[in-house]
């Protein structure tokens, strides 16, 4: 059996197993000398707060945002469908807190945009909705399949 040792003068305020130093932001791009940078631009995010970033409808109530991995928020959306649809498009560029549950194509894909907007408005207040859309190449049709377990 191990012998217990008491050290009254030692204070452990932040043990290495618990304390993780805050890392600075990673460098965006490091190129070897034989590459030449063709574009290096920094642009602020969209500042529009009165329209949904996905369906462009007016926001008449408190907007929903995409939650980032570090606790921040980005975007303004009228519904969870719009938020998750845009989040599924940008998840390779923005570190998200959680995986999106819904994935629709951008409205530019649809011939009848009003049908998609009506679906968004119909399901705006529903919880537990998940699903996606499927593009049928032969018939040039997009099937939207949204489901709920509730």
Curated annotation (Swiss-Prot):
Which one Pfam family would you cite for this protein?
Answer: Pox_TAA1
Q: Which UniProt keywords apply?
A: Activator, Late protein, Transcription, Transcription regulation
Q: Does the keyword Transcription apply?
A: yes
* Gene Ontology MF terms: zinc ion binding
**Record keywords: Metal-binding included?**
no
Name the domain of life this protein comes from.
Answer: Viruses
The protein's role, per its UniProt record: Acts with RNA polymerase to initiate transcription from late gene promoters.
**Similarity comment text for this entry:** Belongs to the orthopoxvirus VLTF-2/OPG126 family.
Q: How does it assemble?
A: Interacts with itself. Interacts with the late transcription factors VLTF-1/OPG093.
Protein name in the entry = Viral late gene transcription factor 2
What is the protein's species of origin? Answer: Vaccinia virus (strain Copenhagen) (VACV)
Q: Which gene encodes it?
A: OPG126
